[in-house]
């Protein structure tokens, strides 16, 4: 943190209008906008919206609130005198924060919107990750950047990753961001981290039937998960995302299947998969963030806060998340946000079945026939494409 403070004191990218940043100010910004996932603390802005503008009644506005008021509310969560927390997330977060962190993050939000938006947000420090004594790879910290022009491209890549529809709107076709499926800006182990993926390419992929480069893998993310258009090989967007992923993987052994890659495997469901049970799980654990209709929630400024899980603004039928097992593995390890691992395997399978049993944008490989498209690309019991749910055949334009 000493490096961070000295960095901001010498740069024109001032953190506070008319002042320079000190250690606590930077830590408040990091907690507020990036979180501390080593301690399972999501960024405040992930639930309260960009800059803490608020998302509905459950996630009220933090921007401009008195620091003392914010501190008092966090303290109320800690001691149990505030109870409007259906999932227990705020109670858990409050108890994971120490007094200094509470002070700094409260100060950060109290100074908004006076605090100028950080155009940089990283220091020039150690930019290599390392393999720890347990054999696990630790990526570079979220408060460091490479120096010079390369660092600026890496920062652009991080911004694209977190705010995809804003920084890559030309190629994005929905309301999702890369970070929705790759938590902590692609750093978090067991959330398909980018550092673990980068070192495994080029590789043969069954989905494409050929050897793909990492850049081609990113292009497919835009085509399927973001329901958009693949950036060209020479685009700034693709270069920035490649550079950011390379930066995260710097120091990782190449070609090794690193611990934390992808989403953890999940035991088969003891009682099959149930749409009805999944609907109940969704109502009890997911709807508070994603809405009763699964369309996510908007911030008070009208921007997408929580992502939609189905419908026209979600991933399409060609995405990896259109496979029930992938969804179940992601949910078990990472959901509810900040409370990963709290659902049972059965609950994860059931709610994954429920989520994937809704209509979404067409698979870009659609050949004019749902039946033949399913036979060619979705012929497995873990895809709901082409199956009938509530009287409608999923993926069929005629049934919409």
Name each region found by the language model.
Residues 1-34, 73-84, 96-102, 106-158, ...:
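Post-cleavage N-terminal segment of exported redox proteins
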Residues 39, 81-85, 188, 227-229, ...:
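Substrate-binding/catalytic groove segments of enzymes
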Residues 344-379:
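A contiguous, mid-protein "functional segment" used to position or interact
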Residues 1, 40, 45, 49-79, ...:
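Gly/Gly-Pro-rich "capping" loops immediately C-terminal to redox-active cysteine motifs
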Residues 38, 53, 99, 167-170, ...:
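Secretory-pathway/luminal and periplasmic proteins that interact with or process carbohydrate-rich
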Residues 48, 78, 113, 161-162, ...:
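Protein kinase-like catalytic domain
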């Amino acid at each position: 943190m000493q490096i961070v403070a000295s960095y901001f004191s010498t740069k024109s990218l001032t953190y506070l209008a008319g002042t320079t940043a000190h250690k606590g100010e930077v830590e408040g910004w990091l907690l507020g906008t990036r979180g501390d996932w080593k301690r399972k603390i999501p960024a405040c802005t992930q639930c309260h919206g960009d800059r803490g503008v608020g998302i509905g009644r459950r996630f009220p506005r933090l921007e401009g609130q008195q620091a003392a008021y914010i501190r008092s509310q966090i303290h109320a969560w800690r001691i149990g005198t505030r109870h409007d927390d259906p999932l227990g997330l705020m109670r858990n977060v409050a108890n994971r924060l120490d007094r200094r962190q509470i002070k700094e993050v409260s100060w950060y939000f109290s100074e908004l919107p006076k605090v100028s938006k950080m155009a940089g947000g990283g220091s020039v420090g150690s930019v290599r990750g390392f393999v720890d004594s347990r054999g696990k790879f630790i990526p570079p910290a979220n408060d460091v950047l490479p120096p010079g022009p390369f660092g600026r491209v890496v920062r652009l890549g991080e911004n694209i990753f977190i705010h995809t529809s804003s920084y890559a709107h030309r190629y994005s076709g929905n309301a999702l961001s890369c970070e929705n499926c790759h938590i902590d800006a692609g750093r978090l182990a067991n959330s398909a981290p980018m550092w673990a993926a980068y070192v495994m390419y080029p590789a043969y992929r069954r989905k494409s039937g050929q050897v793909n480069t990492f850049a081609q893998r990113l292009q497919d993310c835009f085509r399927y998960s973001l329901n958009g258009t693949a950036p060209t090989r020479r685009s700034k967007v693709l270069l920035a995302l490649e550079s950011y992923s390379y930066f995260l993987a710097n120091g990782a052994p190449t070609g090794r299947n690193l611990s934390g890659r992808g989403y953890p495997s999940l035991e088969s469901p003891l009682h099959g998969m149930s749409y009805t049970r999944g609907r109940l799980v969704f109502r009890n654990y997911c709807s508070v963030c994603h809405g009763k209709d699964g369309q996510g929630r908007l911030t008070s400024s009208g921007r997408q806060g929580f992502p939609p899980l189905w419908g026209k603004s979600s991933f399409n039928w060609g995405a990896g998340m259109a496979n029930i097992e992938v969804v179940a593995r992601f949910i078990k390890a990472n959901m509810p946000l900040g409370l990963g691992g709290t659902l049972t395997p059965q609950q994860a399978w059931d709610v994954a079945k429920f989520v994937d049993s809704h209509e979404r944008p067409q698979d870009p490989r659609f050949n004019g026939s749902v039946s033949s498209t399913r036979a060619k690309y979705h012929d497995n019991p873990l895809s709901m494409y082409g199956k009938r749910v509530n009287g409608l055949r999923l993926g069929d334009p005629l049934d919409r």
